[in-house]
Amino acid sequence: MMLIECPNCGPRNETEFSYGGQAHVAYPEDPNALSDKEWSRYLFYRENSKGIFAERWVHSGGCRKWFNALRDTATYEFKAVYRAGEPRPELNTQGGSR
């Protein structure tokens, strides 16, 4: 069992959460003006890097609020969690979390 830190409720079981994709992806200002290729890039093209990755999560089995997290995709370890709308935190060089 893995615990995920909800910024509103505290640590909870991973089964209470749902993954929401890459964080900090801006919605197009005028989606109707996009070509099919540009729209498909917005919808489907995301980073797929190994290491620290900013992600969106929702506490679907709890407060039902969205938040962002920095997670190491190689180890699954959550390095930091922060509320939606807040800037991405800087991690210190020792791998500490917020």
Curated annotation (Swiss-Prot):
Utilization of tetrahydrofolate is probably the physiological reaction since the products are substrates for serine hydroxymethyltransferase, an enzyme which is part of the sarcosine oxidase operon. The gene is soxD. This is Sarcosine oxidase subunit delta. Coiled coil: none annotated. The keyword Cytoplasm applies. It comes from Corynebacterium sp. (strain P-1). It holds the Pfam family SoxD. GO terms for cellular component: cytoplasm. Its main location: cytoplasm. Keywords: Cytoplasm, Metal-binding, Oxidoreductase, Zinc.
